[in-house]
Amino acid sequence: MTSIGIVSPQSMFFDTPLPLQSGAQITDYTLVYETYGTLNADHSNAVLVCHALNASHHVAGTYSEDAGTTGWWDNMVGPGKPLDTNKYFVIGVNNLGSCFGSTGPMHINPATGKQYGAHFPVVTVEDWVQSQARLADALGIKQFAAVMGGSLGGMQALAWSILFPERLRHCVVIASTPKLTAQNIAFDDVARQAILTDPDYHGGDFYAHGVVPKNGLRVARMLGHITYLSDDDMAAKFGRELRSGSYQFGFGIDFEIESYLRYQGDKFSTYFDANTYLLITKALDYFDPAKDFGGDLTKTLSNTRAKFLLVSFTTDWRFSPERSHEMVQALVNNNRTVTYAEIDAPHGHDAFLLDDQRYMNVVRSYFERAYEEIDGGSLKAGASA
């Protein structure tokens, strides 16, 4: 299997206001995206990949010969890979509110002539899906072969199946959940408080002060990273190993796990925007499509039309297998076609990004079967695309 190679992002400007769930609107905006593979003649082989918290439109390939610019899901997407770009036309979109190109807090607010900062409106998963649908319209894609995502990306895929049931044939939801638990909301709030109470945050207008709330971002990332790993994985990687071989009897770094978390926090604070972090964690917290159906997930999913693949990981305690079980049961209650795989993997929530061959084979097999609908299957025989 080879990489897609060097890729370039594209952008599309929208001058029609986007109404948001909050009641606010974004008057005009830009979406940055990348595409891989070739769109077929009837536009029936398009797959939308939705990204998680700190990822972006850069799903696969590289921006140069430097491997450090490799896309965040390059092991999943590419020629001969589970989502095979020799067969599928894959789209990665950067969500509104992000800091990787699409309109967000770092951009100029046309109403003020200044950067949005903390004044960028709160966006939800459903708002992102609405903006993605507009991009699909502009690209001439009436129906996706699949919408796919892991973690927060999986929430977007699920929302697609609810909001636009006729616009996707397959919905692939990996390491995700139909709503956050109180514990998950608590983690997000502590992370936000770390940023909001950093003196360099300046009420979200830190750009004008020429500073970055690095300490808040560092702590937020450290906390988040703990939730992405499993206890077993941390024990195997770090255990109680000491950085210098003995206790220092101070408040610096003694343990290797401390060194690792601080490294992750430091790195994150150099490239991620604090306002974006606040926005995206709020979008996570607010996602609860069953809320409008009295909490009944079966009713929530009753109008879906897609076939589903759900994947969970045994040691993922952020979005545990029980959350996937809830979605599977609700879909079964609605007589939907569901494939479910629970992968015994030690890597916690981050397992959805890693090269577990059992996991990769599940996804590969699913997309191979889905492609039969396009190449000589029901779509080629004349079914609507």
Curated annotation (Swiss-Prot):
Positions bound to substrate: R221, D350
Looking at its record, which EC class is this enzyme? Answer: transferase
According to UniProt, this protein's pathway is: Amino-acid biosynthesis; L-methionine biosynthesis via de novo pathway; O-succinyl-L-homoserine from L-homoserine: step 1/1
Its recorded reaction(s) are:
L-homoserine + succinyl-CoA = O-succinyl-L-homoserine + CoA
Task: Give Gene Ontology CC terms.
Answer: cytoplasm
Statement: the UniProt record of this protein carries the keyword Plastid: no
HAMAP family documented for this protein: MetX_acyltransf
Name of protein: Homoserine O-succinyltransferase
Q: What is the lineage of its organism?
A: Bacteria, Pseudomonadati, Pseudomonadota, Betaproteobacteria, Burkholderiales
